[in-house]
Amino acid sequence: MKALAIVNTELLPEECIKNKEEIDILGTTVTSGVVDITKPSFDIKNPQNDDFVLIHVDAFSCNYRDKALIVKAAIKMNSKETSARPVSFFGSDFVGTITEVGAGVTDLKIGMRVIPNCYYPYKEYEGVATGVVTNEASKGWLKLHKSKVLAIPDYMNDYVAASFSIGAQTSSSMIRRCNIKSTDKILVTSSRSNTSMFIIKSLLTEGYDVTALTTTDWSKEELDFVFPAKVIKIERGLKSWEEIDLGKFDVIFDPFYDLNLLNCIPHLNFNGRYITCGFKNQHSSFEEKMDDVRSNKFNLLMLQAMINNLYIIGNCIGTTEDLRLAISKYNPNNTPIQIDKIVDVYHGAEFLDSTYNMQSRFGKVVMTYKD
């Protein structure tokens, strides 16, 4: 099959690369190309395969976390480091079709469509790592432990499915852990991010009072997608939110603590909950002059947290039950995420550029491996 990869032109012969393209991601040149991948062998008689399945990736998408991995791989290739590989695959969300099953697999069948189950932090099987299932969804073929995928319903299309797992599992966990009351006022920061979008849509489905904070202009269609949430725009790089009339909230969801934590804390009510699942500057090249990452307000922040009995919660992905719940609540008429663009394998640069360089992007960019 044809698969998209970051390619090392110093190590991979030109004849092995089709549709070579270059794009810039925050100052790093990333070279993408299409390579041939053969179906891996899978011996169902081998006991080592008993609890595993072989999956053909039908479509995949990238998350913010993949950006740093892509940039790091490209930097290694560009600097000709000895540890650089000929190709580097990427992508952590996918939908795939099971093509082979091991003898010990009972709940999954050949032909089933599945998505990754990134359960964390609790182990479900000895020797099977928790957390993100793969960083190489673009490889096209994946051999995975049976616990690391879940089947999806027919009414979830491939494009939503390829964008679903990490955002849905993370948002489901964050909402569960905040013990939200029906009267709580909720703020979601960086609201165009994929995780924030999942959070907003899930909260609205339950009837909560949601305010979404953004630094971008939204179209009417985009505002309609999150209605009746109140969308408030602030200037990008604003050092303090004191000059805007935000008010107070009982719960604040924030995907980027290094950008927003210091400004969030003063806007929490007594016994308020702040929860975060990540940070923006996962690589030094991601840092911008307008980022407010001051540490000299830390003492004031902790004083406010102590005086007001605040809860500061860190969240990493979620449990299997969190993902099962998100799948069970999925409504094709009210999807939790928009699909911004769908491209095929021969549009690798467009896929990466749209995913990471377009501030106007609203939702996920999906690459399909289906004809």
Residue ranges and their predicted role:
Residues 115, 252-253:
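N-terminal Rossmann-like NAD(P) cofactor-binding module of classical short-chain dehydrogenase/reductase
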Residues 173, 319-371:
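C-terminal hydrophobic helical "lid"/dimerization subdomain
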Residues 206-208, 259-336, 368-371:
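Glycine-rich phosphate-binding loop and adjacent beta-alpha segment
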